[in-house]
């Protein structure tokens, strides 16, 4: 038998409350991101479905590049839009202009308003925005789970190094199947 076979509704209530304070955060899966996202999009969509089923908040982070000299992630362009293959199941879409998602005042206000303190992270780029966001979340004392098979990078060779980095900063690195079986 499994642990869930022995849970009563009373026993499950604390789990439900914990999940209300948790969020799946999908970072920068936008048209201008590395095409490597196509290798993870199915798992990201599975993670989104799992989050909805488990009553987690589903949050999307978009990067807007305001630098004059660059052409990617420009506000109002197709490149800045979320990738069309991704399931968008909420209106909780926040924009950032720096690599750390916590620099978005609207995002941090939303987290505070809803008491969100635990995160499951998916998206890109593992060596940039995910790295900065995870570091800063862990530094603030949040619980951070990086879904290792739901992240990618422009340079996929850096993924093992990034996973070790996340762990060294106090983040849990897990595969999607490890959390969806709970």
Regions found by a protein language model. Give the residues of each.
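Short acidic, Gly/Ser-rich segments with clustered Asp/Glu that frequently serve as metal-coordination loops
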Residues: 30-36
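Active-site-adjacent betaalpha module
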Residues: 16-23, 42, 46-54, 71-182
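Von Willebrand factor
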Residues: 51-67
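Active-site loop/turn elements of alpha/beta-hydrolase fold enzymes
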Residues: 29, 63-65, 149
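Short, small-residue-biased leader/transition segments that mark boundaries at the very start
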Residues: 1-13
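Flexible, glycine- and charge-enriched loops at secondary-structure boundaries
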Residues: 37, 41
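Short, conserved beta-strand edge motifs with alternating hydrophobic and charged residues
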Residues: 25-27, 59-62, 94-95
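Conserved protein kinase catalytic core
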Residues: 34, 68, 155
